[in-house]
Curated annotation (Swiss-Prot):
Protein name: Pantothenate kinase
InterPro entries: P-loop_NTPase, PanK, PRK/URK
Gene3D superfamilies (UniProt xref): P-loop containing nucleotide triphosphate hydrolases
Protein family: Belongs to the prokaryotic pantothenate kinase family.
This enzyme's EC code(s): 2.7.1.33
Pathway info: Cofactor biosynthesis; coenzyme A biosynthesis; CoA from (R)-pantothenate: step 1/5
Highest rank taxon of the organism: Bacteria
Binding site for ATP: G109, S110, V111, A112, V113, G114, K115, S116
GO MF annotations in UniProt: ATP binding; pantothenate kinase activity
Keywords from the named record: ATP-binding, Coenzyme A biosynthesis, Cytoplasm, Kinase, Nucleotide-binding, Transferase
Length: 331
């Protein structure tokens, strides 16, 4: 059964991308999108999905069937096309010893919108393709400046904003990945201590696919006045995904997650946020609201949401945290 995509219209995606005949996207309902799965097999179990999803994220096996199997099939087509192009370019350049570099998938979106769940589920699905590709997953958290530096520069309340990341290190990492270098080091981050872990790295050794997840990975920057060439993080992506939802929903998810963490991870005395587990529920909720409005909402408006139109694919979630529409950029 063929499915006719509709052009994106005002209101289909929050923030309104270009509508009508000049739209750069096709938009599908979740049910329409699910039919693109075709014969893609379901290779995850319900228990595995529970293990992969983040706290307070209700994504289940049904959502994997509806959304992720079709997305897996689409990404398989893109990876296959990149491999064909690579072989053609090798012949064109007469470079028989050239090695294919990783296919890099960027995943962006607000805090609490479900980026990590999407990244982990995709990583598992892609690794279980018949070709058994090697898939690695990296988050941008490890590229944040250590808390000591953020505190020194009075930037702790700007954590997660573009200036709180070591962009130089991040770009060097991606450059090495795309150069095909082996054993590239990525710094690691502890959500328990809310800080980069000193001298601890994740080694990325020439995977077939690298998933790179973070709130600002589609961020662009002003061109430098001196005219120097400055690459953007997204310049290294072969495919990009933006996880979207109405602002009010993300707000509710963020506060709800904070309150759940107060009852779980924050109980650990080593947690950076342990102090929030000892105050009243009303006081904790007020703090969560303050963090949302004073930090995360500002970051969403100023830096994250404006990058949405740069994505190849936009997953728009509804109140249940499940995807309602899928926008796919036209070729």
């Amino acid at each position: 059964m063929s499915i006719a995509a509709k052009d994106i219209e005002p209101g289909d995606i929050p923030g309104n991308l270009t509508g009508g005949e000049f739209s750069p996207y096709h938009v599908f309902s979740a049910e329409e999108w699910s039919r693109f799965r075709a014969d893609t097999p379901l290779t995850l179990t319900g228990e595995e999905v529970k293990r992969l999803r983040s706290l307070n994220d209700p994504v289940d096996l049904g959502e994997v069937r509806r959304i992720y199997l079709s997305l897996s099939r689409l990404l398989s087509a893109h990876v296959e096309a990149s491999q064909i192009l690579f072989q053609q370019r090798k012949r064109f350049l007469s470079m028989s010893d050239e090695t294919k570099t990783p296919f890099v998938i960027g995943i962006a979106g607000s805090v609490a919108v479900g980026k990590s769940t999407t990244a982990r589920i995709l990583a598992e699905l892609l690794a279980r393709w018949p070709s058994s590709p090697k898939v690695d997953l990296i988050t941008t958290d490890g590229f944040l400046y250590p808390n000591a530096i953020l505190q020194r520069d009075n930037m702790m309340d700007r954590k997660g904003f573009p200036e709180s990341y070591d962009i130089g290190a991040l770009l060097r990492f991606l450059s090495a990945i795309k150069a095909g270098r082996p054993n590239v080091k990525a710094p690691t981050y502890s959500h328990l201590t809310y800080d980069v872990i000193p001298d601890q790295f994740q080694l990325i050794d020439r995977p077939d696919i690298l998933i790179f997840e973070g709130i600002n990975v589609l961020q662009s920057r002003d061109l430098p006045a001196d005219g120097k060439i400055v690459p953007m993080v997204s310049d290294f992506f072969d495919f990009s995904i933006y996880i979207d939802a109405e602002e009010s929903l993300i707000h509710n998810w963020y506060v709800s997650r904070f309150m759940r963490l107060r009852e779980t991870a924050f109980q650990n005395p080593q947690s950076f946020f342990h102090r929030y587990s000892t105050i009243s529920e009303d006081a904790a909720r007020a703090i969560a609201e303050g963090l949302w409005h004073n930090i995360n909402l500002k970051n969403l408006h100023q830096n994250i949401q404006p990058t949405r139109p740069r994505a190849d694919l936009i997953l728009q979630k509804g109140p249940s945290h499940l995807t309602q529409t899928v926008a796919l950029r036209k070729l």
